[in-house]
Amino acid sequence: MAPRRISVSETSRPVLPRHARLKFDETRQRWVILAPERVLAPDEIAVEILQLCDGARDVAAIIDALAVRYTADRAEIGRDVVAMLQDLADKGFLTEARETTP
């Protein structure tokens, strides 16, 4: 089944799809996203954002955490985070967590 593509907003709960994983590559000494036949090397800030994309937190909570951590303007961080996550979603490296049924 193909991953669901998402339109990222502050209410989205992003997560890496099952076929992709974020891993520290010892050989390259950098973080990479591994997917079938593809490797993406995100920068340090993207890695920090991706580590918060656990499917439990929504984008608003991720933005809030980063704004507090860096004592930065929430609106500016929000624009950057949503744009980065949307770019990854468009490339198939990010999807939205599904609701779990009891």
Curated annotation (Swiss-Prot):
GO biological process: pyrroloquinoline quinone biosynthetic process
TM stretches of this protein: none
Gene3D superfamilies, alphabetized: Coenzyme PQQ synthesis protein D (PqqD)
Keyword Acyltransferase: no
GO molecular function, one term: quinone binding
Record keywords, A-Z: PQQ biosynthesis
Top-level taxon of origin: Bacteria
Pfam family, one: PqqD
Pathway(s): Cofactor biosynthesis; pyrroloquinoline quinone biosynthesis
Family: Belongs to the PqqD family.
Subunit-structure text: Monomer. Interacts with PqqE.
Function: Functions as a PqqA binding protein and presents PqqA to PqqE, in the pyrroloquinoline quinone (PQQ) biosynthetic pathway.
Protein name as it appears in the record: PqqA binding protein
